[in-house]
Amino acid sequence: MMKKLLLVCSLCLASMAAWADGLQELEKFLREVSSGKAGFSQVVTSPKRATETVARSKTSTGTFEFLRPNRFRFEYTKPFEQTIVADGQMLWLYDVDLNQVTARSQKEVLGSTPAALIAAGTDLKGLSDAFELKPGAAKDGLEWLEAKPKDRNGQLQMVRVGFKQGQLSVLDIEDSLGQRSVLTFNNWQANAPLKAADFKFEPPAGASVMRP
């Protein structure tokens, strides 16, 4: 579940030829989009083993929503139900099948993660403090931005963010073990009518709660 934490959502756009425009669009996104919700599909591909001819992959689907500052929710619905909620203070991870909740301080675990970038500040300063940014080549009808964490000790190695017509379309995330997670978003609702109470999480009755 902690690896899914890395997935978690936003930079913005830019092609090699339009980096200035991409920065302006990113700044506009951070400034003008304070909340949002979308559906997503996620494909996680593990490095191919010596005995394998094809890399292993798993697909899951769900919904995502966020509210600045520092609140977001991932609801994984298929093939297994899992919930990741940041309420502004704590990060909650709930595995329905295990009936287990893991609670961590957001400050301790988010740091340089895609989710923190989506739901954190409203300007570029924090983004450039945490990541080395460079434009990627346009591909598949998307404009790409590459972000490499300045903290080299974390699990996250690289985030590639694809935008289409100013809308977040794809997050392509690579971790230190070579695992790749690609989230493709759909049905975005920018500035959705969300409130802080929507991100409150209460452990279900009978669930075991772990606080590492």
Describe the role of every protein-language-model region.
Residues 31-88:
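N-terminal mature ectodomain segment of secretory-pathway/periplasmic proteins
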Residues 63-115, 181-182:
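An acidic-aromatic
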Residues 1-5:
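Positively charged n-region of N-terminal signal peptides that target proteins for export
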Residues 28-29, 65, 81-85, 135-137, ...:
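Short linear motifs in intrinsically disordered
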Residues 6-11:
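Sec-dependent N-terminal signal peptides
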Residues 90, 102, 126-212:
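Gly/Pro-enriched, hydrophobic low-complexity segments
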Residues 14-17:
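N-terminal signal peptide c-region/cleavage motif recognized by signal peptidases
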Residues 21-46, 94-157, 211-212:
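Flexible, processing/modification-adjacent segments and terminal tails
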